[in-house]
């Protein structure tokens, strides 16, 4: 069984743990740097990206997270997690982890009162997935090797680049675990490659 960490500094941690377990993997809430060595993949949950960055800095997580990204182990960022993974953020000089060759606009769908749900078609996952968007970012631009998995209107809301997966929405806030299951499969495949 693969072991998937959920960065436990802030955000929808419990919901991700439940979704990982429902997808047949072991979930670990990561609160200490050394726990990164024990896991096969990592979820960066949605929350408030500025607060999350402050906590990442406070607990000296940034370099270990960048090292984890370079190790080739899969990472999945939802909402604020997508912002953490992006190489370029509109209106900001520096990236956070910067592992994905994508450009992201924060709060692109508006403030909290503009939160909404939308039925999405997600490549590799299926149709009619209910995307919960809460002050969501979206992907403005991608490198050639980034696969766009889903759009809402003309906006890219789910993308994959090798071992990295990012979504504007909160898949953990529904009882539909297909997006998490897709990430669990990515982690299993990556672990199999390491074994071979």
Curated annotation (Swiss-Prot):
Pfam families: SNO. Keywords: Glutamine amidotransferase, Hydrolase, Lyase, Pyridoxal phosphate. The active site is at residues 79, 170, 172. Pathway: Cofactor biosynthesis; pyridoxal 5'-phosphate biosynthesis. GO terms for molecular function: glutaminase activity; pyridoxal 5'-phosphate synthase (glutamine hydrolysing) activity. It comes from the Bacteria. It catalyses: aldehydo-D-ribose 5-phosphate + D-glyceraldehyde 3-phosphate + L-glutamine = pyridoxal 5'-phosphate + L-glutamate + phosphate + 3 H2O + H(+); L-glutamine + H2O = L-glutamate + NH4(+). InterPro entries: Class_I_gatase-like (IPR029062), PdxT/SNO (IPR002161), PdxT/SNO_CS (IPR021196). Coiled coil: none annotated. L-glutamine binds at residues 47-49, 106, 134-135. CDD domains: GATase1_PB. GO terms for cellular component: cytosol; glutaminase complex. Its EC number is 4.3.3.6, 3.5.1.2. GO terms for biological process: glutamine catabolic process; pyridoxal phosphate biosynthetic process; pyridoxine metabolic process. PANTHER family: PYRIDOXAL 5'-PHOSPHATE SYNTHASE SUBUNIT SNO, PYRIDOXAL 5'-PHOSPHATE SYNTHASE SUBUNIT SNO1-RELATED. In the presence of PdxS, forms a dodecamer of heterodimers. Only shows activity in the heterodimer. Belongs to the glutaminase PdxT/SNO family. This is Pyridoxal 5'-phosphate synthase subunit PdxT. It comes from Bacillus thuringiensis (strain Al Hakam). The gene is pdxT.
């Amino acid at each position: 069984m693969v072991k998937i960490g959920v960065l436990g500094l802030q955000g929808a941690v419990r919901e991700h743990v439940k979704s990982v377990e429902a997808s047949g993997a072991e979930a670990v809430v990561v609160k200490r740097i050394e726990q990164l060595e024990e896991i096969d993949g990592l979820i960066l949950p949605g929350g408030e990206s500025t607060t999350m960055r402050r906590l990442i800095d406070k607990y000296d997580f940034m370099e270990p997270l960048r090292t984890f990204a370079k190790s080739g182990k899969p990472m999945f960022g939802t909402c604020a997690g997508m912002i953490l993974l992006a190489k370029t953020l509109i209106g900001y000089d520096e990236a956070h982890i910067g592992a994905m060759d994508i450009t992201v606009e924060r709060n692109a769908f508006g403030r909290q009162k503009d939160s909404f749900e939308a039925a999405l078609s997600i490549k590799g996952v299926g149709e009619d997935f209910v995307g919960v968007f809460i002050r969501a970012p979206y992907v403005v631009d991608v490198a050639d090797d980034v696969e766009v998995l889903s759009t809402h209107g003309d906006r890219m809301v789910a993308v994959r680049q090798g071992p990295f997966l990012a979504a504007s929405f909160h898949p953990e806030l529904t009882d539909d675990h297909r997006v998490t299951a897709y990430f669990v499969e990515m982690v299993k495949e990556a672990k199999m490659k390491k074994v071979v």
